[in-house]
Amino acid sequence: MSGVLPHQRPTAPNTIEDERVGTITRRTVLTGAAVTAAVTVAAIDIPAHAHSVDVNSPEHMVLFVLLSSALTGIAPKKLAPGFKLQSSNPPTVPPPPIDLSKSIPGSDPVDVKREYVTWANEKYPSGLEYLLGLVRKNLNASKRDEAIIAALQFDDDDKTKTSSDVDAKYLARSIVLMWYLSAWYEPTELKALRKELPQDPTRTPKFQIISPKAYTQAWALRVAQAHPMGFSEMQFGYWTRPPNDIHDFIGG
């Protein structure tokens, strides 16, 4: 039910793929759609320290799942089954503050979210810390996802923003594409694409397949209620029945 584009054969981990077959492929179309959908991101004043994100920390994983949910529009419990936010006090009105130390980051059969957070942390540690800090800042906001997105929208030429702000903005886009396509698009590549695409409509971004495990977990085909070639979690004969509602796939 999940995975990469159906025409694509499994690709060796960490290989660069930039090959075109003809002028338009399904990957080109879906990648373009995902790049367009990837959010634009802005800033908060958080100091950056390399590798200060601990990928083995349950608290940091909770923040990463919340960040990913806000950016992709996919419910946290779909990204990480069993995910649950906990409060330090009994339920009240308004709700008590969230206690990250008691919250549950959830799991999935292949734990692909750990691959994604590890990849982002190794590539852009300060940017990932920046984004998780933004989630922490808005953790108890009544409309947390909207607050995160609103804080992450600005033009590249905004003079009030720093280079760190811009870097975090494009890292957020890379995280969106990781979840939807199970591939890594360098933030610098996405930034260059934004500038060059109007002049060169044939320009396509280079990317890396993250892992064979990730091949089966891309959300692009889940949203399309489909599955990648050679892998399916759906029961044989599912095509003879009407598809489930989209919310059964992505939550919400």
Question: Which residue stretches match the model-derived regions?
Answer:
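Sec-dependent signal peptide hydrophobic core
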Residues: 33-37
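Mature-region segments of soluble proteins
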Residues: 130-252
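Immediate post-signal-peptide N-terminus of mature secreted/exported proteins
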Residues: 51-76
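Solvent-exposed, polar/charged alpha-helical surfaces in well-ordered, non-transmembrane soluble domains
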Residues: 62-65, 69, 114, 173, ...
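N-terminal secretory signal peptides
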Residues: 1-24
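N-terminal twin-arginine translocation
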Residues: 22-28, 38-56
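Structured domain cores in non-transmembrane regions
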Residues: 75-169
